[in-house]
Amino acid sequence: MKISLSVDELERLICRVEDGAARVMVTASDADAAVHLIAAIDDAAQEGAGECFWEEGGGEYRWMLRRDGDKLRVVVLWCSGTLTGWETVLWRECDFETFRQQVQCEVARLQPVS
C-alpha cells in the first residue's frame, strides 16, 4: 500500500492511497488532520487500535487502525449524515512499520522548513 499526502490551494489535506488496482482519495478540510492520523498510529502501536476523524464540508472520514503483530488493518469509512450511515472507502491489511514510516515521512514532508 502506498500513501501520499498533499495540501491543496484551499489548505485541505489530501491523502491518496494506492494498493494494486485500488486507488482511494481521503480528504480533510483542515491540513492539521495529519497529526490525528499520527496519533492513531501511535495508539495502534501501543494499544493495538487507534482511530481518528477527518472532517470535510459534506461529512467526515473515520480512520480505524487495528494492529495484530506486524500486520495493520486499515479501514476508512465515510459518513455524510446520520441517515446515510457509514460507507466503507478502504479496507486493507499491510505491514505496520511500513505504513507508519510512510505516513511519518509524508507528514514530515508537508511541514515547512524554518
Residue ranges and their predicted role:
Residues V24, A33-V35, A44-A45, L72, ...:
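Short, low-complexity, polar/charged sequence segments that are solvent-exposed and flexible
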Residues M1-A31:
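N-terminal "first-domain core" detector
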